[in-house]
Amino acid sequence: MSGPILVFDSGIGGLSVMNEIRKQLPLHDYCYLFDNARLPYGNLSEQELITGCVALITHHARRLNASIVVVACNTASTLVLPLLRQQLTIPIVGVVPAIKPAAMLSKKKHIGLLATPGTVKRDYTQALINQFAGNCKVELFGTSDLVLLAEQYVAQQQIDMDKLNEILAPIAASNIDVLVLGCTHFPMIATEISHYLGEGVTLLDSGEAVAKRVRFLLSKESNSNKQLQACYTKDIGQGLKAALVDYGFSDFSLVTITD
């Protein structure tokens, strides 16, 4: 397996996961593929999400001769992993909300999950809660607006602090002591979230666990030229492109399923 690590998301949230993978595997080539034309995924029907994601990921994984696919999107991971594994022979890794470590960490046994509406309502999410947090009270907070705020933040745009406060106010009032960031966009604005919620709430995400899994599946480090390629399904603005350059990207492509 010699091709790049293909990291996929609806937008820039998957960069939070890719950053963790690069800490574990710094010498690999990476392609970051994001389907920003259909952002946010939490508002799509299940069939729209499945059809589009599977077609886009499988096509570009084959085109790139990817060594592994990381679906760095919680909403997509709840739906598309089995179909991807049927169509591709390379390893497929998804992200799972950090319910288990949150339940273990919580002293109050009162935790929260902040995710997209799609992730919050999935049977898969409830199964995780039943399996790993049966001894906890679990509060569910669904939002797509926070995805868009994270996109604006990374693109170096002014974010609507009133909207951010509106989203976080019910969480602050809930008396939880651990909050699971169940969307890969949310770690991008973890500092702002933590500032609002205060020191009494610990934030957890799945990035490090995913990175360890990828490292395990890729048995040896690559000796590549460490190229970072960004592919997107809708043109991006100069602010976001500048942010991606700061992340180390040097190759940019507007793509479709058939490119």
UniProtKB/Swiss-Prot annotation:
Its EC number is 5.1.1.3. The active site is at C73 (proton donor/acceptor), C183 (proton donor/acceptor). Substrate binds at D9, S10, Y41, G42, N74, T75, T184, H185. Pfam families: Asp_Glu_race (PF01177). Keywords: Cell shape, Cell wall biogenesis/degradation, Isomerase, Peptidoglycan synthesis. Gene3D superfamilies: 3.40.50.1860. The keyword Transcription does not apply. GO terms for molecular function: glutamate racemase activity. GO terms for biological process: cell wall organization; peptidoglycan biosynthetic process; regulation of cell shape. The keyword Isomerase applies. It comes from the Bacteria. PANTHER family: GLUTAMATE RACEMASE (PTHR21198:SF2). This is Glutamate racemase. The lineage of its organism: Bacteria, Pseudomonadati, Pseudomonadota, Gammaproteobacteria, Alteromonadales.
